[in-house]
Amino acid sequence: MNHPSELKYARTHEWVKIEGDLVITGITDHAQDELGDLVYVETPEVGSQVTAGEQAGVVESVKTASDIHAPVSGTVVEVNTDLEDDPDFVNEDPYGKGWIYKIKPDNIADVEKLLTNAEYEAGL
């Protein structure tokens, strides 16, 4: 599995990348592999508030559906609209083209409370 060291991770299998004052998030390579081929991604609405650990969206595969949890609290400022037509981007490139949404976090320091890649992989 590929879990880049520069990212942070939630125990619920989401990854986080800081980009300026925003946080980009998606599901991990492990999560997409377990789910199988994705057929639908339900993103949160732009402008909505998300709470760390709470459901922010859903991914559906040919096998099952799974909640996407917010890794940090904040306001959703952008969603990856490319996933509407190509949810398989999450399978093909979970840390790149398969990002799901961007958050303006209430407190950017909350990202540091998330797991390193080594901590995340140890919990798999």
From Swiss-Prot:
Needed co-factor(s): (R)-lipoate
Record has Mitochondrion as a keyword: no
Family matches, as Pfam families: GCV_H
Keywords: Lipoyl
Co-factor note (free text): Binds 1 lipoyl cofactor covalently.
InterPro entries: 2-oxoA_DH_lipoyl-BS, Biotin_lipoyl, GCV_H, GCV_H/Fam206, GCV_H_sub, Single_hybrid_motif
Residues bearing the modification N6-lipoyllysine: K63
Residue ranges occupied by any Lipoyl-binding domain in the UniProt entry: 22-104
Gene3D superfamilies: 2.40.50.100
Tree of life domain: Bacteria
CDD domains noted in UniProt: GCS_H (cd06848)
GO cellular component, one term: cytosol
Any one Gene Ontology BP term: glycine decarboxylation via glycine cleavage system
Role, per record: The glycine cleavage system catalyzes the degradation of glycine. The H protein shuttles the methylamine group of glycine from the P protein to the T protein.
NCBIfam families: gcvH, PRK01202.1
HAMAP family the UniProt entry points to: GcvH
Family to which the UniProt record says this protein belongs: Belongs to the GcvH family.
Subunit structure: The glycine cleavage system is composed of four proteins: P, T, L and H.
Protein name as catalogued: Glycine cleavage system H protein
Gene: gcvH
